[in-house]
Amino acid sequence: MSPMARTAPVPAATDPAIIRNFCIIAHIDHGKSTLADRMLQYTGVVQSRDMKAQYLDRMDIERERGITIKSQAVRMPWEVDGTSYALNMIDTPGHVDFTYEVSRSLAACEGAVLLVDAAQGIEAQTLANLYLAMENNLTIIPVLNKIDLPAAQPEKYAEELANLIGGDPDEVLRVSGKTGMGVEVLLDKIVRDLPAPVGDPDAPARAMIFDSVYDTYRGVVTYVRVVDGMLHPRERIQMMSTRATHELLEIGVSSPEPTPSKGLGVGEVGYLITGVKDVRLSKVGDTVTNLAKPASQSLPGYADAKPMVFSGLYPLDGTDYPVLRDALEKLMLNDAALVYQPETSAALGFGFRVGFLGLLHLEITRERLEREYKLDLISTAPNVEYEVTLEDKRVVHVTNPSEYPTGKIAEVREPMVSATILAPNEFVGAIMELCQSRRGVMGGMDYLSEDRVEIRYRLPLAEIVFDFFDILKSKTRGYGSLDWKADGDQVADLVKVDIMLQGEQVDAFSAITHRDKAYAYGVMMTGKLRELIPRQQFEVPIQAAIGSRIIARESIRAIRKDVLAKCYGGDITRKRKLLEKQKEGKKRMKMVGRVEVPQEAFIAALTTDESKDKAKK
């Protein structure tokens, strides 16, 4: 029952034995945020009249797309057998781009609720997050959600879940986040089954940052889980990775609105406000300690967020460049994984090369720039970072085709990923064919049940950042799901394909591609530009080249005036003279003429990824 009417445990004076830290892990769309809503309601921290769907998803984009991007932490009281417990629920993102955030959120917990949609079953990202939870030695409570749906098959999927984590299908809880059925039983089970946090209250303070958000009025709000010792307001604290020191202006818990407290003790989850304005000073995974009595060792598992996908962002209107720069700076306050640097393109003008965690991250960032800052942007095709070694042993890191070195190249290394694909078994052939065509190497295959297969492949990252997810969805009729993680790099036979108009290179259309696919890219791009560039007074050749070797060509025919219109009958030599004269003029025009590529052609040619990105939700 909810103890809101009685005494709820007070932050900073809570015995670790009555604290339970847990998170909910699930694939996108399996009802994680809806279940969180019901928990908030049943524990009484949000009144029914204040309730709104997906209460914890604060960003417009999160609400519209129905995805969780930023983690949230909420403290909820719950009473079992006459004892009041403090439950800390850490809501995690479900998408593959945000795996590091999920891993830090899991490290802040002792247990996880593994949520599976009773109508869809286990999906790739459920598995990936489950393995992360197992690596962190979390106690796992299996739960089937959406059992009120007519299409639900609880018996079938309860067996799948039991096979996966070991146990009995009858132990799998059945709940409905929508109607609230089974939620109270789940809350009781969390209290009974999950272990209490362990830590030394007298040791130097150590707290792990699992998220940080930028608040316009208060600066950076850092969410932490205290492992050892205590943190009090007005203390000086230190971040152990950057050695930066701050004064702790406010400390408290989210319940779910921020509530200041007298401090945070062992096992507690809460927020810190230091008045700092830059999220990069509060890095996810870092350890916070007390400056007066610092800890000697930081908590394990910290890693810097590393961008995987790079894309050029250019404003359609060149005068918007300063606005774009300010907008990116502001977004960086809230998103420590975003990196950018200015770049120029002869065709597109001034812009930025921006690094992202993955395609969803790219799409969300771009959408936020367009929506919150009213910018019209062109984004170039997404690239990955290549490591090019020249024959003189120099190493160049390339994120943009225009930086690709022209000298003698000894080898090129490209990033690899290990991908896990889950799908019904009738699609195995189609999936293997797709992965083979993307230079994939099969790693193994397991049957989760008689009709669901887990297929593992090692693929180049460049092959999956463009349209892989889309094609996978269409080949599996929407039933396939994908999860991937970085897996080193390997040597590859890559070349740079240049597109030339009238013999002049257009940098915006260049691409780094595998030698086997260079011809296909050249033919596709020249064909597309032929359709998009308006006809000129003279013939315009469009060529694709690798170095100095032309691999594909299309021509835009010249517009000709009918110079013979005024000749009624008459001698053929008269007509020939007029045609020769026209030909001379066209030749002269071709020598001095320049082709202006209209903005629309750039947008159409570069947004081949638009339709493809739409499915990556």
Curated annotation (Swiss-Prot):
Principal localisation: membrane
EC nos: 3.6.5.n1
UniProt xrefs under SMART domains: EFG_C (SM00838)
Binding site for GTP: 29-34, 145-148
Reaction catalysis annotation: GTP + H2O = GDP + phosphate + H(+)
Location(s) in or outside the cell: Cell membrane
Residue ranges occupied by any tr-type G domain in the UniProt entry: 17-198
Membrane topology reported for the UniProt record: Peripheral membrane protein
Gene Ontology cellular-component terms listed: plasma membrane
BP GO terms, sorted: positive regulation of translation
Protein name, UniProt field: Elongation factor 4
Organism: Arthrobacter sp. (strain FB24)
Lineage, uppermost ranks: Bacteria, Bacillati, Actinomycetota, Actinomycetes, Micrococcales
